[in-house]
UniProtKB/Swiss-Prot annotation:
Binding site for Zn(2+): 62, 65, 82, 89
SUPFAM superfamilies, per the entry: Inhibitor of apoptosis (IAP) repeat
UniProt-recorded name of the protein: Inhibitor of apoptosis protein
Pfam families: ASFV_p27, BIR
BIR repeats: 29-92
Biological process, per Gene Ontology: symbiont-mediated activation of host NF-kappaB cascade; symbiont-mediated suppression of host apoptosis
Induction details: Expressed in the late phase of the viral replicative cycle.
Species, as recorded: African swine fever virus (isolate Tick/South Africa/Wildebeeslaagte M1/1996) (ASFV)
SMART domains, alphabetized: BIR
Purpose of the protein: Prevents apoptosis of host cell by inhibiting caspase-3/CASP3 activation to promote the viral replication. Also induces the activation of host NF-kappaB.
Amino acid sequence: MFPKINTIDPYISLRLFEVKPKYVGYSSVDARNQSFAIHDIKNYEKFSNAGLFYTSPTEITCYCCGMKFCNWLYEKHPLQVHAFWSRNCGFMRATLGIIGLKKMIDSYNDYYNNEVFVKHKNRVYTHKRLEDMGFSKPFMQFILANAFIPPYRKYIHKIILNDRYFTFKFAAHLLSFHKVNLDNQTTYCMTCGIEPIKKDENFCNACKTLNYKHYKTLNFSVKL
């Protein structure tokens, strides 16, 4: 969960004691709960308790300081994130107090830095393992672009462990959900990355034999 850059107020530190909410209609927890409930969002209490209400599928907003956050759906610690990015929000100061707010910011700062470091390290390792497996550059780009989405992040360690069978299986699973519109594009074999292929295929004729045994073993219904 990250704030939208254009909603960060650089002068907010000059208004430390201003607590008038920007969205008075969402001042109560019930009102914020309702904003999530009508859109069938699960486990929304943690967001409403952090002073946030539903704006759109890609965005939630603080009723007090007005800061907007994106990529929020899988966030486990919205209160900490809100405190970290909007430390002078009147709601956060009233809820946590100055000392509690400072402790939470320091705690999340360590977590945030570690998370960024681990993500970068995982990407580097994953790229190297895919390269060692002999996958083409377009294939590696496809995996790296999609594998770090929250629902799939848990599978990364299997790729890092050089599990070629799993990588093919995982890629086929991703392909079924992330099929790109290739009407005006030339697409290439996902193994060699050299030979052009038809828009509804994944491998060239030379690589089909190499890849068929993997898909046959995994009982996959992927068109070669």
